[in-house]
Structure formats: C-alpha cells, structure tokens
C-alpha cells in the first residue's frame, strides 16, 4: 500500500516549482506527517529536507550551533559523543565545526555518568546520543544524562537510528532531548536498500524552530503554504526533501495508527529477545540482559578456540543464502555481530536464522 500511494499520478506528476495553489494535497501530506511525527518524537516542529540520517544529524547539530551563536555563546565549541555512538555522530560534529569529546561507556554498556559530569562545562555545546544505544540497551539514566548536559548550558541531540524500539512507547522529547532525526527509510517503512532514496526527518523543540531550514509548511484556514523561519540556517537540500519517501511514511503511520506504531516497537523488542535467548547458550552475548530491538554477540572466545572470526561467520551466512548482520560494530565490542530482526520477521524465519548460526 505504501508503494501504491507513492505511485499515485497526483504525486508522481508534481513539480516543486508549480504554484502552491495547485499542490495543496502534497503540502497537506508534508504538514500531516510533520504533525504525526512531532507527536511520536515529542517535538514541536519537523522538516523533511534532509535526504538521509547523517544529513539529518548535520541539520540537527547546525540547529544547536545556530542557537548558541544567536545567543552570543561562542565559547561552546565541544560536542560530547559516547564511545558506543554511530560513526556518523563524531563525523557530523566535526563537519559542523565542533571539537568531539568521546566519553566511555560503563560496564553495563551505558553512559558513564561520572565521565559525563567530568566532560561538561562552559565549552559544551551539546551531547549526541542514541537511546536505546548501539548495544541494544535502553539507558535508564537518560533523564539524569540530559539534565547534566542542560545544567551545563548544552543541548541534547537524539540520534533516532534506534527509534524503532521505542516509538509509541516513550518520546525522545520526554527524555529531555531538544532535537532529533529519524530515518524514515528505516523506521517508517520506506526503502532502505538499493541506495535510497532516504529521508532524515528532523524535529526540534519550539525554541529551536526559528533556526530550522526553510520553508516549513503551515496551515491557515484549511489552506497550506510556506513559512520561512526568521533565523533559519538555510536550505540543506533543494526544495522539500525526498517527497516520495514522505508519502510512503505517511501511509505507514496512518495505516498503523498510534496503537499499531507502539505494537511494531514492542514486536521488534520481542523478536530481538527471542533470538538472543535462542543464541545465548551457543554464543557469548556482549551484554547478557534483556535487550531492546537489537543485541550484540562477541565472537572473541570462538575466535580464540577455533580461529573462526566474525567475518568468517558472516561469510558463512552468505553460503546459506542469508544476508549477514552488521560486523565489527559497535567498536567497544570485539569480534562483534549485531543482530536486529525488526518487527516483521516471523518465528519460522528467526528459527531458521538461529539454526544456521548454530550450525556455523
């Protein structure tokens, strides 16, 4: 149904330069999905200009930079990034002109609060964080984490790569985050493989809205138009983002509804824990506890005993006709394999995959 909606002639035959009076349906799509995702994110404004997740990160961190610059607080030159973060986080911060400060994870795989307290100061611009994090654990100290950063005058950026685990259950805005990106091409049922197209929707709190890339879609008396934020960072992509992806995402959101979105997240968590339970007696879990939507196995012991590495196992998966999982990531886990079944896999498929892992 997502593909059918995106293929409707009324959408595929649009041109971004045609008069907005003749594109009211398209603007309604942008406005409606922005409102729906704002509710899921716990944010007050959403833009679809960024073309992918890392592009969304770049946009979000530019919002943080614009906020501090606008206030004359130019001493805030550092962005804090945990050592378990996605590699795009430090790259994004550096591209935005910030110095990256890495802080270690604790023994539980979560942010080390003492290390965070030691890292923040008058030069802290913000923190970039994923929750649940890259090892599939929800950081229960998240409110304390965002408070530490806010008390130091910094802002908190939510990397929404793992939003699939918590959407409809808890909102990043309620965790204390000020801005967020979400990969529509990952979490909201749009194409993820084949090179795209992607969409890295960015949401922010009201106080950051004036820095958002313009134009934003607004509605007045049933008519849709554009509004340019007064202190906008400027465009980050031509026109209004990858619109066909937005159509697919809106179809997905409206089809599932609030309860369906929550159920999708809960099923993703259930599936990951099912596979973790089936594999934990054969493989070493990096963190042997209830996970969220993904978990990480370490093949260090297997490698020492047999010489079989994570790479070898991944190649073996190909021999069985299965795509291998993410390898050697996150970097804090040696000989890592990351397993993320998502909400759509059946028990039969997961059983088959687990059996192949164990055979290998």
Ranges and model annotations:
Residues 25-28, 55-223, 307-308, 335:
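Conserved PLP-enzyme active-site core in the AAT-like
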Residues 284-319, 335-351:
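Conserved PLP-binding catalytic core of the aspartate aminotransferase-like
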Residues 1-6:
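Conserved oxyanion/phosphate-binding beta-strand-loop segments in alpha/beta enzyme cores
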Residues 12-51, 56:
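Conserved N-terminal alpha-helix of the aminotransferase class I/II PLP-enzyme fold
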Residues 179-300:
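Active-site C-terminal subdomain of aminotransferase-like
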Residues 49, 285-290, 326-331:
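Short beta-strand
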Residues 22-36, 331-360:
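PLP-dependent enzyme catalytic core of the Aspartate aminotransferase-like
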Residues 7-21, 39, 94-103, 123-128, ...:
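Gly-rich Lys/Arg/Thr-decorated short loops/hinges at beta-loop-alpha junctions or inter-strand turns
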């Amino acid at each position: 149904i997502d593909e059918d909606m995106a293929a409707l002639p009324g959408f595929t035959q649009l041109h971004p330069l045609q008069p907005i009076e003749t594109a009211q349906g398209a603007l309604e799509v942008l406005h409606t999905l922005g409102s729906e995702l704002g509710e899921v994110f716990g944010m007050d404004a959403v833009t679809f200009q960024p073309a992918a997740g890392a592009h969304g990160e770049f946009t979000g961190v530019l919002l943080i930079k614009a906020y501090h610059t606008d206030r004359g607080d130019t001493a805030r030159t550092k962005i804090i990034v945990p050592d378990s973060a996605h590699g795009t986080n430090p790259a994004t911060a550096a591209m935005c002109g910030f110095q990256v400060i890495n802080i270690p994870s604790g023994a539980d795989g979560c942010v080390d609060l003492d290390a965070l307290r030691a890292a923040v100061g008058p030069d802290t611009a913000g923190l970039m964080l994923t929750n649940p994090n890259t090892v599939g654990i929800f950081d229960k100290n998240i409110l304390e984490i965002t408070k530490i950063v806010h008390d130091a005058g910094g802002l908190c950026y939510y990397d929404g790569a793992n939003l699939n685990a918590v959407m409809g259950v808890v909102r990043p805005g309620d965790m204390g985050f000020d801005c967020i990106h979400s990969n529509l091409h990952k979490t909201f049922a749009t194409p993820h493989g084949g090179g795209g197209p992607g969409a890295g929707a960015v949401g922010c709190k009201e106080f950051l809205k004036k820095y958002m890339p313009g134009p934003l879609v607004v509605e007045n008396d049933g008519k849709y138009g554009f509004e340019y934020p007064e202190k906008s960072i400027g465009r980050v992509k031509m026109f209004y983002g990858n619109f066909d992806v937005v159509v697919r995402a809106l179809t997905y959101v409206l089809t599932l509804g609030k309860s369906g979105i929550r159920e999708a997240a809960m099923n993703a968590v259930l599936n990951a824990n099912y596979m973790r339970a089936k594999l934990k007696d054969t493989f070493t879990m990096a963190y042997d506890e209830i996970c969220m939507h993904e978990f990480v196995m370490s093949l260090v012991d297997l490698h020492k005993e047999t010489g079989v590495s994570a790479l070898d196992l991944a190649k073996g998966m190909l021999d069985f006709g299965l795509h291998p999982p993410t390898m050697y990531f996150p970097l804090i886990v040696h000989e890592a394999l990351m397993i993320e079944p998502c909400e759509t896999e059946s028990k039969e498929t997961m059983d088959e995959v687990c059996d192949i892992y164990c055979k290998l």
